[in-house]
Regions:
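Bacterial Sec-dependent N-terminal signal peptides
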Residues: 1-26
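Glycine/tyrosine- and acidic-biased, solvent-exposed loop/turn segments at the edges of beta-strands
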Residues: 17-268
Length: 268
């Protein structure tokens, strides 16, 4: 009887140690119970979740994280300066973004890629907040959108372009609000709309042009309200709607990449 119990206990302990080995491999602590040396964590099926190096509780060297399908998810290079250069990948193994973290916040320039490795956007950060120019690009690499940021708020001259290189829109932000002149163009280069904003509201005379460059309509605004509502309904443009509807929204390139990946998954 004792022999049987001993055998069962041995088998149980072996299974327990095997399970531990699958999920926590080479995981060590120093005398103060801080992570130290090589650490490997695994998913329940034994697939590696991440590999990392620690020096008395502090991550050092290169950390690699993996998706459950085994493809690379992230590579993090911990530098002596305290900054961490990071590369992020989707489940198919395509690089989606790269840039620096400092104190767990995005810092300096981050670059975002599509599934074919083309750059789709670049953002500048300071201590986790957008600070500097935010750029978007067409598939051919030409710039499609320029938005300046200061301390996490849109601030300065914004520009949009057609894929032929001509300007599509010029406007201005001040401390996160639309302020000053706005001009929208046709692909031909002729003006389409001309007006002004004051604290996010349309103000004064707004002029609408036809594709030949002739004035088609003039609407006067007071505190964001047109004198003639029917004229507004007819002359509303897609560019103006997008500009005003995006107020207060944080346009993160990762959202655009996520939607693209989801569409690609549906096609398969």
């Amino acid at each position: 009887m004792k022999s049987i119990l001993f055998i069962l206990l041995s088998v149980f302990m072996a299974m327990a140690f095997n399970l531990q080995a699958q999920n926590d491999t080479l995981n060590n602590y120093d005398e103060k119970n801080r992570k130290h040396g090589t650490w490997v964590k695994k998913y329940s099926d034994g697939q590696v979740r991440y590999k990392a190096e620690f020096d008395h509780g502090k991550p050092v060297g290169t950390t690699k994280r993996y998706h459950e399908n085994g493809n690379l998810k992230a590579v993090m290079d911990f530098q002596s300066s305290g900054r961490v250069f990071t590369e992020l990948y989707n489940k198919d193994g395509d690089k989606q973004a790269e840039g620096f973290y400092h104190e767990r916040k995005k810092d300096s320039v981050w670059t975002f890629y599509d599934e074919n490795g083309r750059i789709v956007a670049k953002d500048s950060y300071t201590k986790g907040k957008r600070d500097g120019k935010s750029l978007k690009f067409f598939r051919n690499g030409d710039t499609s959108n320029i938005v300046p940021w200061t301390d996490g708020k849109r601030d300065g001259k914004i520009r949009q372009f057609f894929d032929n290189g001509k300007e599509k829109l010029i406007g201005y932000y001040s401390n996160g609000k639309l302020k000053g002149p706005l001009t929208i163009f046709y692909p031909s280069g002729f003006k389409k709309v001309e007006g002004r904003y004051k604290s996010n509201l349309r103000e004064g005379k707004w002029v609408y042009y036809d594709e030949e460059g002739d004035t088609s309509k003039v609407i006067n605004y007071i505190d964001g309200k047109p004198e003639n509502e029917e004229q507004l309904e007819r002359e509303e443009t897609k560019e103006i709607r997008e500009l005003e509807n995006n107020q207060g929204k944080f346009d993160d390139p990762r959202n655009m990449l996520y939607e693209r990946n989801r569409r690609n998954q549906r096609r398969r």
